[in-house]
Amino acid sequence: MPLLHADTAVLDRWLWLSKRLPPASGQKMLLDVGCGSGAFTIGAALRGYNALGLSWDERNQNVAIERARMCNAKTAEFQIQDIRDLSKREDLFGKFDVAICCEAIEHIIDDEKLMRDIAKCLTPGGKLLLTTPNYHLKPIDPAHEGPFPTVEDGGHVRKGYTSEGLLRLCDEAGLKPESISYCTGFVSQKITHLHFATRKIHSIFAWLVVNPFRIFPPLFDDVVTRWLQYPHYSICLEASKPN
């Protein structure tokens, strides 16, 4: 599974997603908007979804295709697509039961348009699962402290979102918000920081150092984060398209 090589923040997002992605019979369609190297697309496919991952990065898509092959995720498909141009993909409109968008919207200047375009791709009653940096986070990466560019160069164009900001985006896209929650607390953030630091030496070394610590966030992260009143890294939105 590609998630074995991911940092703990990515694992946190998958745990959040998987609780909201019950096993499917193969009839459910899922769209991964800004899929990166395909970890969540593959994870959804292995849970029985017909999953389509979109990303502009050809290298990442090639990695995703190879990972899907290795994982025998036969219902995972990947297409090269700039998500800023999702409105041009009329073939995807009204097709998907679920759309996921994890840590992607903060890279897009016209976030309102992206939300509207995702909503167009959902079936009536379809669900959006979205994660993005929490505006109140304490940055793990110095690049997340700003200043932020006014052009889309692949990095973050804003620090993150508040719950009010996500609710406003839902309203403008015609989506009904169902819940807002958070993931990646203090323990997970510190392990992720260790992963980033050791990865500068070598990716395999980073994996060997960090892997023994992966058991701790599911056990202690929520308790420690509440006790310290520490801001979570990601804010998570669950919304649906009205029937």
Where are the regions that the model predicts?
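Conserved N-terminal segment of class I S-adenosyl-L-methionine
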Residues: 1-94, 98-102, 112-115, 130, ...
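Short aromatic-enriched loop/helix-cap "lid" or pocket-rim segments at secondary-structure transitions
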Residues: 92, 139-144, 189-195
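A short His-aromatic
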Residues: 103-107
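A short glycine-rich, Lys/Arg-flanked "PGG" loop and its adjoining helix->strand segment in the class I
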Residues: 112-124
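Short, glycine-/aromatic-enriched active-site segment of Class I SAM-dependent methyltransferases
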Residues: 131-157, 168
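Short alpha-helix
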Residues: 158-174
